[in-house]
């Protein structure tokens, strides 16, 4: 990407996996998959992008760069049967805040976007009672569309250089 376009101005960490179920008797391989994608993927991608973002923040035309980490309202509120997913999203929020404090004075803005229910494949990775729970929520709620999240990201990264959006909730009106 850098070779093709010459610079990196924005990183959006959006990969995620949500495998729900009770902690007691859980399949720990599912935990490892969620930790690998939701936490380690974000860490490794951020680590690789940071030198390029710091350089872009020093240069014209923007003189600012952005990292937007996609978390979840599950990073703010814990629910039964969401334990490890909650863990990963609370971790994303904590990492985002720490990184924000480290690099914002160097003009790399770091923010977290925490969506509520969105029409994605995220819930389809579940089965049984958890899938029924997710399907019931989707049927009873006018959930967000991907464009709603894209609009939130665009809002965060297009503020003037002097303004940094550290946290943005985007919720379905029915869920708020």
Label each PLM-derived region with a short phrase.
Residues 24, 77-83, 141:
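Active-site loop immediately N-terminal to the catalytic Tyr-X3-Lys motif
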Residues 46, 88:
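Active-site helix of classical SDR
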Residues 51, 101-104:
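Alpha-helical segment proximal to the catalytic Tyr-Lys
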């Amino acid at each position: 990407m850098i070779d093709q376009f010459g610079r990196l101005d924005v990183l959006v960490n959006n990969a995620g996996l949500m495998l729900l179920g009770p902690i007691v008797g859980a399949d720990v391989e599912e935990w490892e998959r969620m930790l690998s994608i939701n936490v380690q993927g974000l860490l490794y991608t951020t680590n690789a992008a940071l030198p390029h973002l710091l350089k872009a923040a020093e240069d014209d035309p923007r003189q600012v760069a952005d990292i937007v980490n996609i978390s979840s309202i599950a990073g703010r509120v814990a629910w039964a049967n969401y334990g490890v997913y909650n863990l990963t999203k609370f971790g994303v929020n904590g990492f985002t805040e720490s990184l924000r404090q480290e690099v914002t004075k160097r003009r790399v803005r770091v923010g977290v976007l925490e969506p509520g229910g969105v029409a994605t494949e995220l819930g389809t990775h579940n089965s049984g009672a958890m899938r029924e729970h997710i399907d019931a929520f989707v049927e009873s709620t006018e959930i967000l569309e991907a464009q709603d999240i894209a609009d939130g990201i665009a809002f965060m990264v297009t503020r003037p250089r002097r303004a940094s959006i550290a946290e943005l909730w985007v919720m379905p009106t029915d869920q708020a």
